[in-house]
A protein has these predicted regions:
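Alpha-helical oligomerization segments
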Residues: 170, 181-233
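Cys/His-rich short segments
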Residues: 111-180
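N-terminal alpha-helical interaction blocks
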Residues: 1-115
Length: 233
């Protein structure tokens, strides 16, 4: 069983008891069996479990818990970054919490993710005219501007050579289908807490913590997926 297949168990629209089939066992699993399996998964892989369901907007509590657990992971790894060890304990925790929050947002990002348009401050109008960046919507999608969220683009040279459309991973988004949160945005948020982290220090050192935490979320989700699969085998 995969994590995606159990999202429906958290939907309030589902009032009928759901029965699913385990991949190997001929015995059907009832809704209570699945919830018990989820409880065990949450205990064994707390970060991955909370991160996934927070990403799927199933629970705001899971989202907050994932960021809190991720911040603790960041705190344990902060000794690798001299710029962070020089901060006071309060400042260090505040900075790491900010980085963890943005790491989660980056992890949960998809082509359909919407955010307020910075050009018009979410108003849809610039100087009384329709904002050209968001077309007056006040929000912009994270979908890659080159591949439009598909993750692949036409290789024009090979297409002309072969006479049929030839696709390749989009170079702009590396095949993700969406644009990641710029690290400069995270740096500006960190500067609201402390001025001790300079742009040079951020680019050379502290920014790596952001990348580490994003990768950690993906690793932990994979571990939660594997754990659930073993439990429901």
């Amino acid at each position: 069983m995969k994590l995606e297949s159990v999202v429906k168990y958290h939907s309030p629209r589902s009032v009928t008891p759901i029965v699913c089939q385990s991949s190997l066992s001929p015995d059907a699993m009832s809704g209570s069996d699945v919830m018990a399996a989820l409880g065990m998964t949450q205990k064994r892989a707390p970060l991955g479990y909370s991160a996934f369901f927070g990403k799927m907007n199933v629970s705001g509590q899971d989202r907050a818990r994932a960021i809190r657990l991720l911040a603790m992971t960041g705190l344990q790894s902060s000794s690798r970054y001299p710029a962070l060890t020089k901060l006071s304990e309060e400042e260090r925790m505040a900075v790491i919490t900010i980085i963890a929050g943005y790491a989660f947002l980056d992890y949960a990002r998809s082509p359909d993710t919407e955010s307020p348009c910075h050009a018009c401050d979410g108003k849809g109008l610039c100087n009384g005219k329709c904002c050209s960046k968001c077309n007056g919507k006040g929000v912009v999608r994270a979908a890659c501007k080159d591949c439009k969220g598909r993750g692949e683009a036409v290789n024009r040279v090979m297409t002309r050579f072969q006479g049929v459309p030839v696709y390749q991973p989009c170079k702009r988004c590396s095949g993700r289908g969406f644009e990641r949160i710029p690290s400069a945005v995270v740096f500006r948020a960190v500067c609201q807490v402390t001025q001790a982290v300079t742009l040079d220090t951020w680019n050379k050192s502290v920014k790596q913590l952001l990348e580490f935490l994003v990768a950690e979320l993906h690793r932990e989700e994979a571990w939660a997926e594997k754990t659930l699969s073993r439990i429901t085998k």
